[in-house]
């Protein structure tokens, strides 16, 4: 039994499967006689006091502001590594996924605004369909096994990382509330201290962890969303070291990855995906927020990714990865419409102070759009890869 669990956890698809199970469990509880218990659990107040410092939030916000800061720390570490020595370390490597990611953010936002522009209650959610859930998307890709070209996986990963950078910028610029200058000054001091530690060659993680905690608290109190602290911390932690030394950034990334995959993201999905369908029907998908998010993910994402990629290649600003064709790019473009945890997260920011119905409709659009995108992409990519394999076998026999 233990061996079977270890084998499951070692599979690339395990993270995506756990996310699906977490979403299913949340939906089941939210629409069962246990709905009150589920909501009460999320509303449980959790208070931390240390002298004059007082942080008092419901459990749901500890998940969204605290655990997701660790997730964004992991994203920051991955982005930094890819920028320095990975899939984004040169113009030639980064050009195609960069154009694809830009298109994949612009088009969904335009589709959403097409249904919600001028609607004060809903137009603030324009960024919801701009996000891609990389864990879920890679999980779907992993279900296809070794048939998926490595270059196609790298393209999706690079695209999603650039997409994450875009989401980080969007959160910082558009979803920050009234700012506290005192807290921002403390945050700046913490950042400056970590930069100095890096420049002085300090490779021990403990001082970065202590200053990172101070930064998270300061950002939490500043009005800027606390998850951004994770990204800043990641960029301050040293990546390059002398030969024979262990990279603190790589060590932390490796250590955080299983926690993110098997605890943070499933817990976030469980806490945020519990949408009560009471009073909802198929007609609810026609609500502006639901329709904008659903079609933004289902149509806007693939159109943006594909059109911007095609234009970049035709204009010779980028080139297709070796061994990858347009059919495969098209299927992956649809897969980018899997927004799930990232879209739900942005929804929680966009409609934090709005009527409950608006946030619920946005989550409904996210769940339906993401599931349809994942299903279509899986079957499309299966067909494309089978066709490619058939052509390869024919060429070998001829």
UniProtKB/Swiss-Prot annotation:
GO terms for cellular component: plasma membrane. The keyword Transmembrane applies. The chain crosses the membrane at residues 17-37, 59-79, 95-115, 125-145, 154-174, 179-199, 213-233, 262-282, 288-308, 331-351, 364-384. InterPro entries: Na/H_antiporter_dom_sf, NhaA. It comes from the Bacteria. It is found in: Cell inner membrane. One of its GO terms (molecular function) is sodium:proton antiporter activity. One of its GO terms (biological process) is regulation of pH. Gene3D superfamilies: Na+/H+ antiporter like domain. It catalyses: Na(+)(in) + 2 H(+)(out) = Na(+)(out) + 2 H(+)(in). It is a multi-pass membrane protein. Keywords: Antiport, Cell inner membrane, Cell membrane, Ion transport, Membrane, Sodium, Sodium transport, Transmembrane, Transmembrane helix, Transport. Belongs to the NhaA Na(+)/H(+) (TC 2.A.33) antiporter family. Na(+)/H(+) antiporter that extrudes sodium in exchange for external protons. This is Na(+)/H(+) antiporter NhaA 2. It comes from Shewanella denitrificans (strain OS217 / ATCC BAA-1090 / DSM 15013). The lineage of its organism: Bacteria, Pseudomonadati, Pseudomonadota, Gammaproteobacteria, Alteromonadales.
């Amino acid at each position: 039994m233990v061996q079977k669990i270890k084998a499951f956890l070692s599979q690339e698809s395990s993270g995506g499967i756990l996310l699906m199970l977490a979403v299913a469990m949340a939906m089941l509880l939210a629409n069962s006689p246990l709905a009150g218990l589920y909501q009460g659990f999320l509303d449980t107040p959790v208070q931390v006091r240390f002298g004059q410092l007082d942080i008092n939030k419901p459990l749901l916000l500890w998940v969204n502001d605290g655990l997701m800061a660790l997730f964004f720390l992991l994203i920051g570490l991955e982005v930094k590594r890819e920028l320095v020595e990975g899939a984004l370390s040169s113009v030639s490597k980064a050009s195609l996924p960069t154009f694809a990611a830009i298109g994949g953010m612009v088009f969904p936002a335009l589709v959403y605004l097409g249904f919600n522009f001028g609607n004060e209650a809903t137009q603030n959610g324009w960024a919801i369909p701009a996000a891609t859930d990389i864990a879920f998307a890679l999980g779907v890709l992993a279900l296809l096994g070794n048939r998926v070209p490595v270059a196609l996986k790298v393209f999706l990963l690079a695209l999603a990382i650039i997409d994450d950078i875009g989401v980080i910028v969007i959160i910082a610029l558009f979803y920050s509330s009234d700012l506290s200058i005192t807290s921002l000054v403390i945050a700046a001091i913490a950042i400056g201290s970590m930069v100095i530690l890096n420049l002085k060659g300090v490779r021990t993680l403990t001082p970065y962890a202590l200053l990172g905690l101070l930064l998270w608290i300061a950002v939490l109190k500043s009005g800027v969303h606390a998850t951004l602290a994770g990204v800043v911390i990641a960029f301050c932690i040293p990546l390059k070291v002398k030969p024979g030394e262990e990279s603190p950034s790589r060590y932390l990334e490796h250590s955080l990855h299983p926690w993110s995959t098997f605890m943070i993201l499933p817990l976030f999905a469980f806490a945020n995906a519990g949408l009560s369908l009471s009073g909802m029907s198929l007609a609810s998908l026609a609500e502006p927020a639901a329709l904008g998010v659903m079609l933004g993910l289902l149509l806007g994402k693939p159109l943006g990714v594909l059109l911007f990629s095609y234009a970049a290649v035709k204009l010779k600003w980028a080139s297709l990865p070796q061994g990858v064709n347009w059919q495969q790019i098209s299927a992956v473009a649809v897969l980018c419409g899997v927004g799930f945890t990232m879209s739900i997260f942005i929804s929680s920011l966009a409609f934090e102070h709005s009527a409950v119905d608006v946030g619920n409709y946005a989550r409904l659009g996210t769940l339906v759009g993401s599931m349809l995108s994942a299903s279509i992409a899986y079957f499309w990519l299966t067909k494309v890869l089978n066709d490619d394999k058939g052509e390869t076998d024919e060429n070998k026999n001829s």
